[in-house]
């Protein structure tokens, strides 16, 4: 404490409200990262003061006034944490609440502290048996605490608690009766308290000393005398052995713990008692609060500040007064508010006299700039940009993306109907622009349009109105990207085009597996969709829902909405490890349908077991040898891995006069697979931590070699950007525990010699990270050689770029060229060349259909369905089944107003499947349901859409439902089995049903009555209720929808359609239907006195 220290500011602590009287502060603390002083009172109100003048900054309540005082403050980089008697409250420094936590066992909280350095959690304690550890936010802790938790008890004891187990490590009796104040810092604890002076009168008095305890040696030290009776004590934050002690009347002593007999004395001019005392983190300020509701700030007037590295304080913006306008002939019209007008203004200049100014600068290639030579007046070089001398480049046209968003399908339909030329497409719109052949897209300085992140646009008709076909002219299906966790689209595509993995997924999905969160089944369902789509766009909604519900996914940082992983590349690599582990686990759970192809491929005497097949396809079998560098002892453990991380050589400086060593992909892969590393670890022989050396001995490599690129430095990026660095084929030899890898000419030489048992692997493809600059978002694409997955082998490579729903062919050079600035691989898959084009379709002929004949509620008297008869009703390609579903809403649509004042849909309403009904379409029991499943939904439902779905909250609750409630997996698999048996699905508006179910049905297996009763020239599709009223003379959907009733009605309409077609009057009937529809507004008329009593789905009895 310098000689010029004195009271700098004194303010009155504000009253809790305008009608209340001032109250003393109950908590006082300096902010650790801002120039703020915080105080709280006994009414739960928190107030902050800014700077040396204690200017009032913010004020808010942390709990109701009846809950008592504010106890303590802690500070985090995101806000301030305030402790009440029954709650913990965190708010931003400018006031808004971040969170407020309460608990039934929070009875009388007294104190809190951060648990440890680097942990974003606090421990809260009080006069109760339970301590609470609260997770604050994920971020950096700005204040370090000691090794132990120091706790003061009611009886005057100081207990040291282990922060992990909360057990008492050491205890001291500091004071006879109670502890009034305590502080801990570095290796010292200081306390001041009181003792009972008169037993009969129960009179307590503060002790005339301060106790000191040494945490390093776990001993008590010589007390510091303080004759004025010590009321408060604080350790100096900068001087390790200095403390400041104060009495209730304002006498302050600055005392050295090691020399307590000498002190520096100051006096604070207070008219009452001091009840709070704090020192700033900088050590340059003191704050005291007295019982007369005053706050005193002490320090050196010339250098007082609260913290050394203070963040700027966000102050409220001053409201700008309205400008004064002087009306004159020179005043611009735009400065005055304009009324609404209907005629064109004179200021509306025609476009031919308006020109753009301030064109953006030319984007120059970094390689072109590097080739220029510097002179005193600037740079010069060869003109390699293709422009003539003094020619100006139109940079506005260059910056416009070459791939403009397409028109909505409804817009195209209207334009086609108006021009009567629907068969002639507009080449400017329909044709996807092709990249220039002069230069590879991957060599451009920034990501070109074909690699950029694409967004789905929504019209009032939803996502079905978006023209996905504009982005994909190939036979290979893309995936929609507006679903949570759709960053995994690229990895799903890569696995799908790996034949061995696709075979495993489809074989497993065709078994009797009904495990709810089986990701291998979900992969099989997605792969089946992609195969059946034939170039249409699919979605992996059910797969991502299962991934999100898997307990291990969130802790591993695999979910987009809950992760704080810095890059999508890291998430994709983590997902590859997780999915391969799940494939390994799920495939072993049940015997596959058929493994004859794998038996032939691996040359086995009998079909492999699930364990054997998983090991041969996925696992790099190895043993890790751990060697202690001190005692030279060695231990071994299994080191099998499904995914290998590449390991790059350390960076080396270029030696003068010597040649730089060329690093090949094969060398990096060998280093990554064998993985020789050194680290600190426990040696059981030395009984202490030693330097350990670890190395893998490789026994076998899998048929599918999954590799994470593990790029972490600029040197790694430059290595990948080397032309031709990634080979399309590699050769691997495993001999006597060593792994050898060859590529290019070395591979050809080994194959010609034939001396070693070398296995050739083909590059299937890779997940590529595209790092785009703002406003584009970084995202993932996949680059895949689909030739290895086609049914027939191809002599040439067929590289394709899968950018979510955009799919296009690219050249081999484009596929294997990377750019250190924006295009780098994250995950690579190699497969044994002998397995290319090997597709096992035995699962279709041996499909497990037992689920169709299982009655999950056999003893219910209120059944609305009867399952199929195994003998009399086997479904097949000639079977027609009526289908209808009901949905509920999980998320409301996100809508915003655009710059034109129009409503624009950012994200449409999110639906979930709630009920699936399937009825027989032929036979003796035609129209009778054999599936009527209600779906148990995990996600919170925001709207049951009861008016349209007939679903009520009790229908989907396992505790109250009267219906057949099943998991989404069971309901989906029944439909998937029917689909792969070749059944035809009949219904009305099935496109939306299939979308919510998340299933892809070929057109040949769909009979949609909304299409058969549709005139394209009318641009109006007819509702089921209207068709039923006009053609069947039936009234349906009077109050709510019933899926069984709707499926039966669609079946009856289809029978009518067949009658009209056989009679040759279909076109005439359609004209009559539309004619009557226009007169009734395409709605079935209702009689005014008609009273409708809606009932539930009728029960069936046989």
From Swiss-Prot:
Cofactor binding description: Binds 2 metal cations per subunit in the catalytic exonuclease domain.
Listed cofactors: a divalent metal cation
Alphabetical keyword list: Cytoplasm, Exonuclease, Hydrolase, Metal-binding, mRNA processing, Nuclease, Repeat, WD repeat
Localization, UniProt: Cytoplasm
Cited Pfam families: PAN2_N (PF20770), RNase_T (PF00929), UCH_1 (PF13423)
Regulation: Positively regulated by the regulatory subunit PAN3.
Annotated region described as Disordered, given as residue ranges: 423-442
Primary site of residence: cytoplasm
Enzyme Commission number, as recorded: 3.1.13.4
GO-annotated cellular components: P-body; PAN complex
WD repeat windows: 20-59, 104-144, 269-308
Domain USP: 446-833
Residues that coordinate or bind a divalent metal cation: 884, 886, 993, 1046
SUPFAM superfamilies in alphabetical order: Cysteine proteinases, Ribonuclease H-like, WD40 repeat-like
Catalytic activity: Exonucleolytic cleavage of poly(A) to 5'-AMP
Quaternary structure and partners: Forms a heterotrimer with an asymmetric homodimer of the regulatory subunit PAN3 to form the poly(A)-nuclease (PAN) deadenylation complex.
Domain notes: Contains a pseudo-UCH domain. This ubiquitin C-terminal hydrolase (UCH)-like or ubiquitin specific protease (USP)-like domain is predicted to be catalytically inactive because it lacks the active site catalytic triad characteristic of thiol proteases, with residues at the equivalent structural positions that are incompatible with catalysis, and it cannot bind ubiquitin. It functions as a structural scaffold for intra- and intermolecular interactions in the complex. The linker, or PAN3 interaction domain (PID), between the WD40 repeats and the pseudo-UCH domain mediates interaction with PAN3.
Family: Belongs to the peptidase C19 family. PAN2 subfamily.
Protein name from the UniProt record: PAN2-PAN3 deadenylation complex catalytic subunit PAN2
Protein's organism: Chaetomium globosum (strain ATCC 6205 / CBS 148.51 / DSM 1962 / NBRC 6347 / NRRL 1970) (Soil fungus)
């Amino acid at each position: 404490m310098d000689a010029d220290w004195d009271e700098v500011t004194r303010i009155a602590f504000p009253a809790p409200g305008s009608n209340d009287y001032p109250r003393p502060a109950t908590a006082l603390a300096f902010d650790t990262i801002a120039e703020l002083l915080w105080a709280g009172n006994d009414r739960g109100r928190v107030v902050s003061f800014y700077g040396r003048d204690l200017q009032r900054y913010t004020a808010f309540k942390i709990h109701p006034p009846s809950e008592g005082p504010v106890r303590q403050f802690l500070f985090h980089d995101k806000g301030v944490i305030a402790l009440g008697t029954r709650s913990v409250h965190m708010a931003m420094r400018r006031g808004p609440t971040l969170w407020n936590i309460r608990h039934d066992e929070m009875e009388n909280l007294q104190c809190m502290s951060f648990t440890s350095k680097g942990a974003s959690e606090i421990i809260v304690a009080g006069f109760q048996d339970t301590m609470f550890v609260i997770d604050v936010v994920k971020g950096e802790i700005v204040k370090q605490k000691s090794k132990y938790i120091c706790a003061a008890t009611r009886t005057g004891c100081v207990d040291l608690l282990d922060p992990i187990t909360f057990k008492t490590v050491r205890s001291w009796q500091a004071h006879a009766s109670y502890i009034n104040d305590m502080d801990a810092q570095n290796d010292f604890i200081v306390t001041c308290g009181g003792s009972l002076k008169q037993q009969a009168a129960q009179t307590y008095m503060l002790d005339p000393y301060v106790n000191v305890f040494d945490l390093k040696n776990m001993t008590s030290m010589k007390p510091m005398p303080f004759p004025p009776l010590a009321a408060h004590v604080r350790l100096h934050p900068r001087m390790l052995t200095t403390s400041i002690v104060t009495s209730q009347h304002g006498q302050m002593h600055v005392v050295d713990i090691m020399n307590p007999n000498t002190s520096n004395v100051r006096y604070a001019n207070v008219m009452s008692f001091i009840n709070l005392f704090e020192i700033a983190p900088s050590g340059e300020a003191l704050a005291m609060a007295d019982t007369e509701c005053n706050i005193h700030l002490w320090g050196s007037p010339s250098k007082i500040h609260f913290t050394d590295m203070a963040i700027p304080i966000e102050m409220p913006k001053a409201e700008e007064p309205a400008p004064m306008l002087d009306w004159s002939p020179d005043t611009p019209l735009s400065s005055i508010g304009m009324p609404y007008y209907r005629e064109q203004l004179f200021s509306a200049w025609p476009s031919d006299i308006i020109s753009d100014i301030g064109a953006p600068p030319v984007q120059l290639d970094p390689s072109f700039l590097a080739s220029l030579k510097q002179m005193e007046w600037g740079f010069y070089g060869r003109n390699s940009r293709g422009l003539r001398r003094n020619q100006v480049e139109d940079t506005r046209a260059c910056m416009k993306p070459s791939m403009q968003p397409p028109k909505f399908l409804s817009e195209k339909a209207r334009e086609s109907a108006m021009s009567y030329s629907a068969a002639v497409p507009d080449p400017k719109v329909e044709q996807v622009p092709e990249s220039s052949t002069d230069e590879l897209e991957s060599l451009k300085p920034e990501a070109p349009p074909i690699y950029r992140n694409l967004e789905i646009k929504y019209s009032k008709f939803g996502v079905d109105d978006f023209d996905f076909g504009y982005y994909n002219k190939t036979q290979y299906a893309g995936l929609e990207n507006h679903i949570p966790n759709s960053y995994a689209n690229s990895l799903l595509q890569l696995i799908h085009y790996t034949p061995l993995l696709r075979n495993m997924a489809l074989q497993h999905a065709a078994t009797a597996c009904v495990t709810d969160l089986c990701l291998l089944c979900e992969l099989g369902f997605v792969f089946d969709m992609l195969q059946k789509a034939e170039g249409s766009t699919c979605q992996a909604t059910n797969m991502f829902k299962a991934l999100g519900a898997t307990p291990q996914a969130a802790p591993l940082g695999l979910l987009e909405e809950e992760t704080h992983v810095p890059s999508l590349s890291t998430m994709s690599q983590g997902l590859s490890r997780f999915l391969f582990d799940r494939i390994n686990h799920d495939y072993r759970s049940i015997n596959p349908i058929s493994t004859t192809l794998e038996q032939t491929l691996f040359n086995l005497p009998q079909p492999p077991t699930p364990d054997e097949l998983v090991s041969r396809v996925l696992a790099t079998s190895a043993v890790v040898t751990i060697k202690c560098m001190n005692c030279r002892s060695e231990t071994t453990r299994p080191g099998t891995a499904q995914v290998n991380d590449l390991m790059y050589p350390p960076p080396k400086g270029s030696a003068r006069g010597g040649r730089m060593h060329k690093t090949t992909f094969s060398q990096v892969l060998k280093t990554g697979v064998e993985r020789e590393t050194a680290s600190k670890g426990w040696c059981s022989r030395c009984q202490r931590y030693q330097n350990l050396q670890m190395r893998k001995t490789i026994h076998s490599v899998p048929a599918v070699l999954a590799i994470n690129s593990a790029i972490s430095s600029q040197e790694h990026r430059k290595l990948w950007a080397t032309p031709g660095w990634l080979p399309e084929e590699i050769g691997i030899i495993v001999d006597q525990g060593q792994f050898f890898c060859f590529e290019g000419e070395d591979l050809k030489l080994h194959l010609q010699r034939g001396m070693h048992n070398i296995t050739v692997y083909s590059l299937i493809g890779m997940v590529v990270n595209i790092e785009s600059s703002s406003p584009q978002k970084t995202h993932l694409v996949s680059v895949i050689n689909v030739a290895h997955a086609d049914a027939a082998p191809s002599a040439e490579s067929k590289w394709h770029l899968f950018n979510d729903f955009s799919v296009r062919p690219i050249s081999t050079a484009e596929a294997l060229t990377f750019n250190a600035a924006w295009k780098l691989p994250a995950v690579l898959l190699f497969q044994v060349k002998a397995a290319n084009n090997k597709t096992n379709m035995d699962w279709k002929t041996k499909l497990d259909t037992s689920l169709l004949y299982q009655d999950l509620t056999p003893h219910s008297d209120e059944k609305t369905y009867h399952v199929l008869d195994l003998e009399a009703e086997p479904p097949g390609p000639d079977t027609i089944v009526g289908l209808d579903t009901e949905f509920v809403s999980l998320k409301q649509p996100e809508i915003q107003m655009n710059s034109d004042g129009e409503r624009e849909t950012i994200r449409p309403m999110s639906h979930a499947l709630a009920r699936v009904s399937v009825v027989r379409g032929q036979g003796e029991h035609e129209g009778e349901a054999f599936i009527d499943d209600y779906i148990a939904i995990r996600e919170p439902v925001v709207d049951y859409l009861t008016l349209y779905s007939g679903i009520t909250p009790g229908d989907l609750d396992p505790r109250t439902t009267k219906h057949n409630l099943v998991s989404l997996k069971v309901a989906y698999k029944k439909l998937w089995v029917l689909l792969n048996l070749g059944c035809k699905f009949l219904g009305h508006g099935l496109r939306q049903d299939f979308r919510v179910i998340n299933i892809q049905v070929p057109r040949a297996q769909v009979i949609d009555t909304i299409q058969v009763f549709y005139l394209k020239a009318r641009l109006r599709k007819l509702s089921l209720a209207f068709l039923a009223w006009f053609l069947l003379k039936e009234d349906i959907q009077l109050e709510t929808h019933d899926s069984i009733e709707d499926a039966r009605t669609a079946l009856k309409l289809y029978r009518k359609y067949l009658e009209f077609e056989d009679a040759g009057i279909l076109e005439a009937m359609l004209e009559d239907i539309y004619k009557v529809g226009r007169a009734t507004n395409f709605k079935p008329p209702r009689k005014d006195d008609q009273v409708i009593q809606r009932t539930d789905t009728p029960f069936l009895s046989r």
